[in-house]
């Protein structure tokens, strides 16, 4: 290209310049294609791979056809002996390989002593003894303290003998209470104390009797009145029947 330009400069005639220009236009320019560069790259990588394989030691494949470079000379098995499950897990785990390859790793472990042992004098109390030896503290008001075999009672088997029993009213007491109820359904504190003294009852018993009597009357009124205590509602059908 430079020679063509020099000829153009040296030529004085326009015809020579035209011929040189046409010759320059007709000469094609070619760049190296990617297809031509690929074989050279493949050849270089192949030569590098061959040089690496030639410098590295060759490992004999195992019976299964697998070659493990990290396990050569580290475990006691070879083509004639298959690794166990624990050994295979140690091979595949990089933590174990780093530990065994490092000679100072085993010196960093602390050796612990035997686990704690129970003392020889310690004994568990047995429950095979007689239950009569077990004593349960009781209060002064409980009935278990008065019984001869109070020590045999257990917390879940304490009797309820100390509970006050219900005392029924006598006929003369009921008749007098009914008379007082017919006169007045609610007693004052003074009248309640007088009535309890006359009937030889506690004021609480008189109060409870009047409460139960009022509840009984309420239930009787509800039973007689039905679901409509203020009377049945008047419907158009009932109005026609009345008229």
Swiss-Prot record:
Biased composition (Polar residues): 1-12
Region (Disordered): 1-23, 40-67
GO CC field: nucleus
Matching PROSITE patterns: HOMEOBOX_1, HOMEOBOX_2
Keywords associated with the record: DNA-binding, Homeobox, Nucleus, Transcription, Transcription regulation
Primary location: nucleus
A Pfam cross-reference name: Homeodomain
Entry annotated with the keyword Kinase: no
DNA-binding region(s), chain positions: 162-221
KO phenotype (gene knockout): RNAi-mediated knockdown applied to adults causes posterior morphological abnormalities in their F1 progeny. Knockdown by feeding of dsRNA to stage L1 larvae causes defects in tail tip morphogenesis and reduces expression of dmd-3; both of these phenotypes are exacerbated on a php-3 mutant background. Knockdown represses expression of microRNA mir-57 in the AB cell sublineages.
Gene Ontology biological process terms in this record: anterior/posterior pattern specification; embryonic body morphogenesis; embryonic pattern specification; nematode male tail tip morphogenesis; positive regulation of miRNA transcription; positive regulation of nematode male tail tip morphogenesis; programmed cell death; regulation of asymmetric cell division
GO MF terms held by the record: DNA-binding transcription factor activity, RNA polymerase II-specific; sequence-specific DNA binding
Nucleus found in the keyword field: yes
Cell compartments where the protein resides: Nucleus
Protein role: Transcription factor, involved in posterior embryonic patterning, morphogenetic movements of the posterior hypodermis, and cell fate specification. Binds to the 5'-TAGT-3' motif in regulatory elements of genes, including Meis protein psa-3 and microRNA mir-57. Involved in a negative regulatory loop with mir-57 to specify posterior cell identities. Required for asymmetric division of the T hypodermal cell, acting via the regulation of asymmetric expression of psa-3 in cooperation with ceh-20 and the Wnt-MAPK pathway.
Complexes and interactors: Interacts with nuclear receptor nhr-25. Interacts with geminin homolog gmn-1. Interacts with homeodomain protein ceh-20.
Name this protein carries in UniProt: Homeobox protein nob-1
Upper lineage: Eukaryota, Metazoa, Ecdysozoa, Nematoda, Chromadorea
Gene for this chain: nob-1
């Amino acid at each position: 290209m430079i020679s063509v330009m020099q000829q153009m400069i040296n030529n004085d005639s326009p015809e020579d310049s035209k011929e040189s220009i046409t010759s320059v236009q007709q000469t094609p320019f070619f760049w190296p294609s990617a297809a031509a560069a690929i074989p050279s790259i493949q050849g270089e990588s192949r030569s590098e791979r061959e040089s690496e394989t030639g410098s590295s030691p060759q490992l004999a494949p195992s019976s299964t056809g697998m070659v493990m470079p990290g396990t050569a000379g580290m475990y006691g098995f070879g083509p004639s002996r298959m690794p166990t499950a624990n050994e295979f897990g140690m091979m595949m785990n990089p933590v174990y390989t780093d530990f065994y390859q490092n000679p100072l790793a085993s010196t960093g472990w602390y050796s612990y002593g035997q686990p704690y042992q129970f003392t020889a004098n310690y004994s568990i109390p047995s429950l095979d003894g007689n239950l009569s030896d077990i004593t349960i503290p009781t209060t002064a008001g409980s009935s278990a303290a008065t019984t001869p075999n109070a020590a045999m009672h257990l917390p879940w088997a304490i009797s309820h003998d100390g509970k006050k029993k219900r005392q029924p009213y006598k006929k003369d007491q009921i008749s007098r209470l009914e008379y007082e109820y017919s006169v007045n359904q609610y007693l004052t504190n003074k009248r309640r104390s007088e009535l309890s003294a006359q009937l030889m009852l506690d004021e609480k018993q008189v109060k409870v009797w009047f409460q139960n009597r009022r509840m009984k009357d309420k239930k009787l009124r509800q039973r007689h009145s039905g679901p409509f205590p203020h009377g049945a509602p008047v419907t158009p059908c009932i109005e026609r029947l009345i008229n």
